[in-house]
């Protein structure tokens, strides 16, 4: 059975890099963050309603890649269940909506309640912020505030999770160790 591992955290905390590294290491695929594609195509001036479009696009992308992994029968050398690494989920959309607009679409909250994942990796803010055309929060105080919001969400839900921190190699090894433990 496919195990879905979601990587979340504030912007510029290495989520996409970690997803890509883990997918390569475990010989599987990863689901990128749909928001990047949407914002690159439509511009960085987004509305509350755009966030619902992004949320739906994220889940459509996740479902497409889930089908691809399930149909490919990707398994690692120990013949353990397949893995799918997901960069961003509806918790990220909830935090984004509430942080920017002070409210969240009901549809996003409904998806949080009904979707199931096997593990969360929460990326800490201890990496240097890297500027790109889509990032909004270069200041560490805001990023740490967002990190605490994500951590509170994970503490108050049932899916197991682990905080990922340190240098890039330390983060990668910590994530690999957590996933190997999950797969035993």
Language-model features: locations:
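Conserved nucleotide-sensing/catalytic segment adjacent to the nucleotide-binding pocket
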Residues: 45-73, 79-101
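The conserved Walker
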Residues: 11
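A glycine- and Lys/Arg-enriched "phosphate-lid" helix/loop adjacent to the NTP-binding pocket
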Residues: 100-168, 176
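Conserved lysine of the Walker
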Residues: 15
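Conserved substrate/cofactor phosphate-moiety recognition/catalytic segment
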Residues: 20, 24-59
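Pre-Walker A (Motif I) flank of P-loop NTPase domains
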Residues: 2-4
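Hydrophobic anchor at the beta1->P-loop junction of P-loop NTPases
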Residues: 7
């Amino acid at each position: 059975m496919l195990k879905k591992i979601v990587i979340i955290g504030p912007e510029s905390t290495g989520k996409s890099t970690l997803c890509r590294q883990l997918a390569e290491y475990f010989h599987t695929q990863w689901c990128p963050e749909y928001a990047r594609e949407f914002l690159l195509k439509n511009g960085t001036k987004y509305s509350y309603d755009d966030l619902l479009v992004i949320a739906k696009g994220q889940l459509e992308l996740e479902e497409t890649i889930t089908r691809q992994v399930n149909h490919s029968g990707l398994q690692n050398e120990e013949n353990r269940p397949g893995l799918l690494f997901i960069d961003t989920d509806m918790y990220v959309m909830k935090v984004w909506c509430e942080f920017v607009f002070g409210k969240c679409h009901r549809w996003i909250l409904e998806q949080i309640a009904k979707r199931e994942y096997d593990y969360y990796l929460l990326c800490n803010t201890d990496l240097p912020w890297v500027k790109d055309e889509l990032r909004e929060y270069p200041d560490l105080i805001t990023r740490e505030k967002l990190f605490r919001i994500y951590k509170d969400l994970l503490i108050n839900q049932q899916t197991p999770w682990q905080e990922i921190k340190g240098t890039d190699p330390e983060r990668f090894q910590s994530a690999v160790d957590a996933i190997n433990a999950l797969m035993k």
